[in-house]
Structure formats: structure tokens, C-alpha cells
Amino acid sequence: MANILKTIIENDKGELRKLEKMADKVLAYEDEMAALSDEELQAKTEEFKKRYADGETLDQLLFEAFAVVREGAKRVLGLFPYKVQVMGGIVLHHGDVPEMRTGEGKTLTATMPVYLNALAGKGVHVVTVNEYLTERDATEMGELYSWLGLSVGINLAAKSPTEKKEAYACDITYSTNAEIGFDYLRDNMVVRAENMVQRPLNYALVDEVDSILIDEARTPLIVSGPVSSDTNQLYHMADHYVKSLDKDDYIIDVQSKTIGLSDSGIDKAESYFKLDNLYDIENVALTHFIDNALRANYIMLLDIDYVVSEDQEILIVDQFTGRTMEGRRYSDGLHQAIEAKEGVPIQEETKTSASITYQNLFRMYKKLSGMTGTAKTEEEEFRETYNIRVIPIPTNRPVARIDHSDLLYPSIDSKFKAVVQDVKERHEKGQPVLVGTVAVETSDYISKKLVEAGVPHEVLNAKNHYKEAQIIMNAGQRGAVTIATNMAGRGTDIKLGEGVRELGGLCVIGTERHESRRIDNQLRGRSGRQGDPGESQFYLSLEDELMRRFGSERIKALLDRMNLSDEDSVIKSGMLTRQVEAAQKRVEGNNYDTRKQVLQYDDVMREQREIIYAERHDVITADRDLSPEIHAMIKRTINRIVDGSSHSDQDDKIEAILNFAKYNLVSEDSISDSDLEGKSDQEIKDYLFERALEVYDSQIAKLRDEEAVREFQKVLILRVVDSKWTDHIDALDQLRNAVGLRGYAQNNPVVEYQAESFRMFNDMIGSIEFDVTRLMMKAQIHEQERPRTERAISTTATRNISAKAPNMPDNADLSNVKRNDPCPCGSGKKFKNCHGRKK
């Protein structure tokens, strides 16, 4: 272990030596750039672009380009990047993460690699965690970029598609991670190429990269539409039943935060819902409602996991920032179950139309880098998931902050009593204090206690984060006391007021250890910026969430040995800190394993999504007749139907193929048994394809010009693809839940998921081609005048496609259709799951 650690440290040192040499080359241009006039310095941008176009690489331009940005920043912003900032910029350009402490000027560091990569003209995305930082950084740094001749765009959720397209067309685009993800998904749902807003994803520089790529890695971005179903009553019934349970009726696993019914709970459910067996196949939907009601009532906590807004809406609280996540909803019915629990209006369920996780979104960029003050603890995950190295950058000035050892109290009450006393004493001497909490509930509790103690303070949590930047900016003033949920206000520097340095600087007090060491380090890092003095102190209790879930037994034993009878007794020891860090490492390991598994599942979806989106993009951008592609779909559909019927005896086979042809290819009275009898399978395939092409040509002939034909073909294909893809996503979600149970049968759930999803994907492709064939053959296309506008073309095409194939006639003879044959109605389903379903 010691050897591994030594190797890592030596590698870091070697990397830093290389970076220092490169930074010195940038600094060597300092006098040359200072001697240039404004016009000469600004002209460098066009010179670099020309040199890049003539074959020079960005790596070759780096030293001079970085020097131009340094000089430009000095003239425009009054800021001159230090050598360590130049080193950080080089790391960013190479597609890695420089770990730079809070207050070391990460925003200014980013200007150099952003400028350099923007010279290529392929777009640079600077990604921030919220829109306040997006606008702030784009406005402040945009001055420099504009002065140097580069265009800057700001992408906000409220902007129109036209404004978004303009923002993405700029050399540099500032945006939140969520908005880039949603724009990507929406771009893959449009019908016309001109409605897409993004260019191909080129280079992303992610601010607070650990927050986005690690903490939010599991969060799927979902574009969804409503599902018409009257299920509100079931949510209320399940909630009412769950609230009637005693503690013995359910089992909670505190460590994994899972819950299930005990035998007595199952008995009560069968009695309450009047069932013979709760786990009969017919009751699968009901058990899902009960499971969600259990989670909502006994796992999900008000003011910790979510808050109820003034508008009676359930808002999710981000566990890593303490902010509410506007517009986000728990999936799979959990959000509705919480609404039932809290007695607020239940919003309708939705069906996923498109989704992607941040892991797979950001892995699509050609080059990815990011900045943070705390990434080294997650180095393995950055390397394994994103192929990114983490390189610690030295501070410009030595860190003067004093980090005190943790204090452990027997109970939460005694802990908070000590926190309030400490805050009061520091406030009275004028030292500013930042109190960090992990939950809204804790913030409110400490606030109440400080009011009782007569200590004036500001509270910053999920309930009032609109003024967070202003509150955080004032947190370093003399006598200021600020309570902040976790890392709220991250990205905004706390600058010390007059006379505060002499009082010891800002004191950060942590009221609980977070499950991630990185989050604790971020809280500590709010103090002691740029060599300022400061202090940090964590207060813990045996009743804290982390201590309850992981590793508290040894610490309890330690307490017993010390025989602490006084409630206000406190432990302060190195062993305690080591035990807490060991507990945090276990949680981090669990979370990493979970994220890895999510990625394994999502990689399956990613491969399928990329195939569908690539095909979709090809259709949207095609400036040609798509008849060859549609002909191929028709041919494959016919082949599948004929091959699928070959196992039947001759009469049954002819009957099944005839029904398919009548209801999906040609008019009913234009084909009969005699047309198919006596032919081999290949001859039947050739005959039906020939007949289908005749119908296809007659359908196309009804459209008066090539533009109308292309529009009709595009809308037809896209409509079918989007419908089937949405159903497929829904089916994959259900499959993922189902394969989890197969793990109990000693099967690997991920392997099962991969195999089953591959089969389902192939089925979906067949279903897409079947529907395109059926709609193409049976759509009722009316002769029309040439439409005057694109909108008219689209409307007409959509209206034409809306004409469905005729339903199965009441007197249709289905006696010879086998259960596993395709249903002759043309639904694409097997007969047993369609018109052959037992009533």
C-alpha cells in the first residue's frame, strides 16, 4: 500500500515538473505581449485561426495563445493569471482535471484553454451548475473573449429555440449541464434539421466537475409526456394502507435504504385489499403502488429529501447542494406516492420519450475537462468512467487555515448545544462563522436555537436559494453568522471583511460529516482562500446518519470504555477521525459501485440510443428520395412474415400470409389463395414484394412534387420511430426492474439485461419496419395542390399518415392463424397478444 501511495505521489510530482516547464514557456512571452498595442494584441486571434487552418495544431499554438489571454485579461479585467493558473489551464486543455483549491481563481484559469480551443471554430461549452453562475461567468469573462474577437453565447432554459441555436453557434457557449442534456434530447426528437439547436459536441469544460460528473452521475435527464390513466385512487389507497401499519409490519434496511413488507404486513395487505395472494401475477401493479407508498412514508423524509412548496408542489432537494431541483420529479410513481403522503394534488404520471444520464452525455464530447477544488478522492472514478486524470495544482500562497480534529458527542442535542455555544462565542468577538448542514431540517433547527441565544444570522437553504450569492458574499464580514445547507453558494467566493484576518479569519463549522469526504473538504475550503487565515471544526454525534449507518459500533465501544456518563462529554482523538474516514470510504465505495452498475445498464441503452439517433439524423438531414430505404423495409417485413409462417402446414401458412397481405400490403379484393398456392417461400416473397412496389408507386404518385414526397416519407418514418422508441424505453425500464429479481436465482442481472434488451431492440426494429410498411401501403393519400409553405407540407403529410390501416373486419376468418404468428390486423404484435388474446 505504501509503495502504491509513493508511486502516485511521485507521478504527481513528475507531472507538475512538466507543467512548470510548459508554464515557463508561456510566461516567457510576457514582455513581448505587453509591448503590443491593443489592436495588435486583438489581431492575434485571426492570426491564430489562420495558422490553425494552415495546419498548426492547438498544442503548437498553446504557449503564444495563453500569453495573449494573460495580457488581454490584465488589460480588460485587471487580472493577471499566476503561473499556477497557467499550469491549471494546460491541464484543462489536455482534457484532464486540475484540482485547484477554493479561491485560486478557477474562473480566470479557464479563460486560457477556452480561448485556445475556440480558435478551432468547433464550439466550446463552459458548463456550470446553475444559471446564476452561467450568466455571471459569461458576463464577466465574456468581456475578455469579445475583446479578443470571439463570440460568446448564454444558453438558458427560458430561451427560445432560435435564441438557443444562436447561443450554440457562438465560439464559446455558457450553459448549465441540465440544459445541454435536455437540448441534446430535444434535438433528437425534432422532425426538421433546421429545428436542431446544437452543433456536434466538441469540447466541454465543466466547472465544479465533481458535482456534475460524480454526484449527479446517476441522475437521468428525462423528456416525458403524460400517460392517460386514472391511478390517483390507487395512490391514495396504498398510502392509506401503509399509514395503518405498525413497525413490525415492514422491514427497513438502514444501510441500503430499502424497505419491504414483513409477513404480518402482507397479511394486512391481503385483508385490506381483499386478496387471496398479494403476490399473484394479477397484483403486480398493486404491489408497485404499495412499494412506492412504503418508500414515500418511511424512507423519504420531508425537509431532507424533499420540501413542500407554497404552491403545494413536492420539490426534490439535491442531497449534494441543498438546493431544490426545479422541474425534476422522482420517476416510476414515487413522486405521486409522496404527493399522496403529503396530501397535495397528485400530478399525472408521465411516460419517458427520451432519456440520458450525465455520464453518457459528457462522454460524447470529443474532449472533456473540468475544474474543482476536490477531486483527488474520486480519481479512480474519473479515470475509469471518463478517461480523465486528476492533477493537484499547488496553491499560489501556502494554506494558513487550521483544521481542528472532530468533536464527538453522545447525542444530537448535546452536539447542537455545543455548536450554538461555539458560534455565540465567536460572534461576540467578531469572527465570521459559516455553519454547514446536510439538511434543510438541520438548518431550521440551528436557526431556531441561535434566535433563542440572541445571535443574528442568515439562513441559506433549499427554501430561499434565490439570494444565495448575496448571502455568501457577505459571509466573511465582521460578526457575520451564516447557516448554509451543504454546498449552497458554491462557486461564489467568500472574501474577508476589514479586520477579520486579525480575528482568525472565517471559521467553518460542520454540524455533521457528509457521507463523502469530498463534500466535507469543499465545506472546509470555503475558509482560508488565497493564503487567508481561517479555521474549520466538525461536530459529530453518535446519532448522526453516517454514524448510524456505518461504523458506529467501534466508536460506541470506545465511548463505553471511556465511561462517559455526562451527556455533554466530548471525545477528541485521532482514532475518531480515522474511524469516521473509514466509514466515509465505505459509503463512497458503495456509491461508486452503484454508479458503475448504473453505467453498465445505461451503456446498453446508449448503444441502442446512438443507433436510433443516428438513423433519425440521417432521415432528418436527407435531401433525397427515401424510397430505397422504404423499399428495403417493405422487403424485410415481407420476408419476416413469410419466414415466420413457414413452420405451419401449407393451408395455414397460405391463410396467414394472405391475411397479412390483405390488411397490410394490397387491397383486400386484389389478392386470393390462388395467387400464392404452388409457390415456394422465395417465390411468395418475390411476388408480394412486386405487388407492394406497385402499391407504393401508386401511393407516391398521389403526391404532386418531389418536395411533398420527401416530406411525406420523412414524417412517416420519424413518427413510427419515435412512437416505437418511446415504447421501447418504457419496456427497458420495466425489464431493468424485472432482471433485478433474477439476481436471486444466481443469474447476473446485467448480463440478463444485455441479452434481453438486445432481443427487444431487434423486435422493435422489426416493428418499426412493419408499421412503416403498413402505413405506407394503407395511408389514405389524397391528391393535393402543391403546398405553399413548409408548414403546409408537414401538416398535410402528418394528416395523411394519420389515416390508419383498416381494423380487422368483424367477419375475418382467424381460425388458421397460429398463436405466435403476427396478427393479421397489422399491429405488429403476435396474434396471441392481439386479436387472439383470450377474453
UniProtKB/Swiss-Prot annotation:
Cofactor: binding comment? May bind 1 zinc ion per subunit.
Can you state which reaction this protein catalyses? ATP + H2O + cellular proteinSide 1 = ADP + phosphate + cellular proteinSide 2
Biased composition annotated in UniProt, kind: Basic residues: 829-839
SMART domains xref list: SecA_DEAD (SM00957), SecA_PP_bind (SM00958)
GO BP terms: intracellular protein transmembrane transport; protein import; protein targeting; protein transport by the Sec complex
User: Binding residues for ATP, per the UniProt record?
Assistant: 85, 103-107, 493
Question: Which key words tag this protein in UniProt?
Answer: ATP-binding, Cell membrane, Cytoplasm, Membrane, Metal-binding, Nucleotide-binding, Protein transport, Translocase, Translocation, Transport, Zinc
Q: Where in the cell is it found?
A: Cell membrane; Cytoplasm
Q: How does it sit in the membrane?
A: Peripheral membrane protein
**Positions that bind Zn(2+):** 823, 825, 834-835
Q: Which residue stretches belong to region Disordered?
A: 800-839
What's a single GO MF annotation on this record? protein-exporting ATPase activity
Domain of life (superkingdom):
Bacteria
Tell me, in one coarse class, where this protein mainly resides.
Answer: membrane
Q: What class of enzyme is it?
A: translocase
Instruction: List the EC numbers from the record.
Output: 7.4.2.8
Q: Identify its protein family.
A: Belongs to the SecA family.
General function of this protein: Part of the Sec protein translocase complex. Interacts with the SecYEG preprotein conducting channel. Has a central role in coupling the hydrolysis of ATP to the transfer of proteins into and across the cell membrane, serving as an ATP-driven molecular motor driving the stepwise translocation of polypeptide chains across the membrane.
Q: Tell me what this protein is called.
A: Protein translocase subunit SecA 1
